[in-house]
Amino acid sequence: MTLRFGSLRVPTTVHWPGVETVSLALVLTDELSPTDPWVEGFVVVALAAGMPGSIELEALQWVSEHVGELGAESDRMLVAGGARAARLALATRDRGWPVLQRQLLVHPAFGLKHPMPANVAGAPPATVVFRSEHDMGRRYAARLRAAGVDVQEVHDVGER
């Protein structure tokens, strides 16, 4: 697990479309890099690639217990990544802790390794970044919305 503070300013103010200005902690699964420019300004806890899902839950629990020491607010936490982040967000729903402000899903790729969850009712609000109209992320956003979850969709037209 890697801990990084964006620009060494903690707590920090973050502006994200559709979300009020907040100070928050971000648990980043291995689909994204803590050096991606969009994570600048977040208190980031990044998990190494290939870590089992139980480690993600343990990391999220640790962050929720130490969020004040990290300079963020306990009610301002989110998870980010792809399919693993979506499953982590659902695990928080199932356990009732910690309460996530949002899940940020960037090009979530569901498949054999990470099948698309069937029961998404009660999931945290989501921002889903997708590449095309036929993207799995777009389908997952529709599934979340149909279950009554607040969803913001962002069409990524750039190359990654």
Language-model-detected regions and their locations in the chain:
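Domain-scale detector for complete catalytic domains at protein termini or as standalone homologs
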Residues: 1-160
